[in-house]
Amino acid sequence: MAEAALAGQLPDAQSGLRLLTDPGIELLPLLQAAFRVRFHHFGRGVRIHILNNVQNGYCSEDCNYCAQAKNSKAPIEKYSIKSDEEILEGARKAYESGAYRYCMVSSGRSPHAERIDHMSKLIREIKSRWPVEVCLSAGFLDANKARELKEAGLDRYNHNLNTADGYYGSICTTHSYGDRLNTLQEARRAGLEVCSGIIIGMGEKPEEIVEVATTLRSLQARSIPVNFYVHVEGAQLGAVDQLTPAYALRALALFRFFNPDAEVRAAGGRESNLRGMESMALYPANSLFAEGYLNTTGHMAEKTVKMVEDAGFFVEKIEEE
């Protein structure tokens, strides 16, 4: 499969399903094949992303996996938008910690015009101070909002599909899968890179994981965060699937084969789901989060960098001009 991917011949759905479910496909040769594709496009470099949850809670949506959803009973700290000083300080720390990209995440259905103006100002300030790429995740966009963010210098917009179209109604009822697709398409039309991924382990079928990989390929997603579900006490979706490290690694390999030149990230839940096999994620994936997620903790940057280097990889940074 590596030879086919390197030649531009991408796998079909049946081949993808076999990668996830066929015990006759041994894990280590699969990871080695995925690494050949990863190495061709990214070498041994690893891009570290650091999130800043700039607004937490107060969300109108009912995504049942999310601790911030309107019907969640999770005991999270709710706060409106952080001060400019806090957000800029987060960017400075991200850069000094070795981050390739600083990702600002704001809860809510869609940012109003004043919020877009505010975020655009912050994006310009960050880009003027530090050589770091900037990603924003703030809900649904229309053409005008996407265009303003692009003009401000935003590199990438994140809006996760999270699961397949046919399963989406099982995890959310306040908006549709089509709403998410529309935002990704508007971001692309504005010239923004698209970041979109999945949460694995919410009760979906293997076929639906393959479907998401295929959809992201059609959207030309440049960044794919592969999250592994972690139940937060009080969230409406309980503990659903017990993922094994081997299954999680197979999923990362799947996304690499289906999206050979995309940035594939071992994202939320990697620590608790990959466990002792965490460093093996670097064979298919070329990107990691550090310093935690939205409402769950993760490894600090120093520990993440050490894991990367111990595994024979290196942290990739943007060169200063």
UniProtKB/Swiss-Prot annotation:
SMART domains: BATS (SM00876), Elp3 (SM00729)
Organism of derivation: Magnetococcus marinus (strain ATCC BAA-1437 / JCM 17883 / MC-1)
Reaction equations catalysed: (4R,5S)-dethiobiotin + (sulfur carrier)-SH + 2 reduced [2Fe-2S]-[ferredoxin] + 2 S-adenosyl-L-methionine = (sulfur carrier)-H + biotin + 2 5'-deoxyadenosine + 2 L-methionine + 2 oxidized [2Fe-2S]-[ferredoxin]
GO MF, one example: iron ion binding
The protein's name in its UniProt record: Biotin synthase
UniProt record similarity statement: Belongs to the radical SAM superfamily. Biotin synthase family.
UniProt keyword terms in alphabetical order: 2Fe-2S, 4Fe-4S, Biotin biosynthesis, Iron, Iron-sulfur, Metal-binding, S-adenosyl-L-methionine, Transferase
Pfam family, one: BATS
Cofactor: [4Fe-4S] cluster; [2Fe-2S] cluster
Binding positions for [2Fe-2S] cluster per the UniProt entry: 103, 135, 195, 265
CDD domains cross-referenced by the UniProt entry: Radical_SAM
Quaternary structure, from the entry: Homodimer.
Cofactor note: Binds 1 [4Fe-4S] cluster. The cluster is coordinated with 3 cysteines and an exchangeable S-adenosyl-L-methionine. Binds 1 [2Fe-2S] cluster. The cluster is coordinated with 3 cysteines and 1 arginine.
NCBIfam families in the cross-refs: bioB (TIGR00433)
Record-linked Gene3D superfamilies: Aldolase class I (3.20.20.70)
Source organism phylogeny: Bacteria, Pseudomonadati, Pseudomonadota, Alphaproteobacteria, Magnetococcales
EC id: 2.8.1.6
Highest taxon of the lineage: Bacteria
Keyword Transmembrane: no
Name of encoding gene: bioB
Pathway linked to the protein: Cofactor biosynthesis; biotin biosynthesis; biotin from 7,8-diaminononanoate: step 2/2
Function comment: Catalyzes the conversion of dethiobiotin (DTB) to biotin by the insertion of a sulfur atom into dethiobiotin via a radical-based mechanism.
Radical SAM core domain sequence ranges: 44-270
Record GO biological process: biotin biosynthetic process
Binding, [4Fe-4S] cluster: 59, 63, 66
